[in-house]
Amino acid sequence: PMTLCVRTLYRVFPEIRAFGCCHEVFGTQRFLARMVEEVFQQESVDRHEIKVNPVGVNHFTWLTQASWRNQDLFPVYAEFCEKHRDGYGEKPVDDNWVNRMFQCREQVKMDLFRRFGYMAAAGDRHLAEFCPGKWYLADPECVREWKFGLTTVDWRKKDLKQRLEKSARLVSGEEKFRMNDTGEDGVKQIRALLGLGNLVTNVNLPNRGQIPNLPLGAVVETNARFAANTVTPVFAGNLPETVYPLVARISGEQQMLTEAALTRNLDLAFAAFTNDPLVTVLLSDARKLFDEMIENTRAY
């Protein structure tokens, strides 16, 4: 929903100054840092040492450049992906990947690199969401084969309940708030906006030309420069030809869905729904599913 939220803000209030933050690229930087440690026998490589150029949409970003201490990591990554065809990282005790909601063996992102030549920069469970449905999400067995986890609705409900309970304890004073580093860039972004230094990090903004081959105004994710009272997108270049069809389809669907919601146009919403790469059923079945979802969420 990140892209849709940012797009809606600018659609309703064009003068707004808003941006969307996401840590998926950070996770890919950490993954590449672990690769650097293995390949170059380094210790404790920080993700900030991995310099990247992300292009795409939220949760479906691609790196067209990645380096460590001025060394191009693409050739290194190509060899790394071949070496770790069975996955990378520690294997969990429970090998049922359907129950390992936030763990993966990075197989999806490495498969996408071998096929398209660019680094997919998000967690495997998110990357799978934006690819054609039969690739990685055909059924639970397919998920197990690709060794990533699915987040269940039951877990989300329990997690929300626990977080609301924690909030209540903090408000009442029953629990003391503890300051710690979350690994996010939010504080650094605010400091930069206040004029306390500059920062370059990846965020979601309307396309002003930072990705020339996606529509102007579409919300895209690239690096941006934060400085006193300003956030300026960094020119990232075109989406590569190999991944352009995948990303352009998602971007178009997101724009359709925003327009459908704001104009209350169910026909346009259905067109966006059937355009989604995960919708692989017959049109008649898609219509039944769509109508059922609309009816069951009507109260909201």
Residue ranges: model-predicted function:
Residues 1-66:
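Internal, well-ordered domain-core segments that constitute the primary functional module
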Residues 37-300:
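Long, compositionally biased stretches enriched for glycine and/or charged residues
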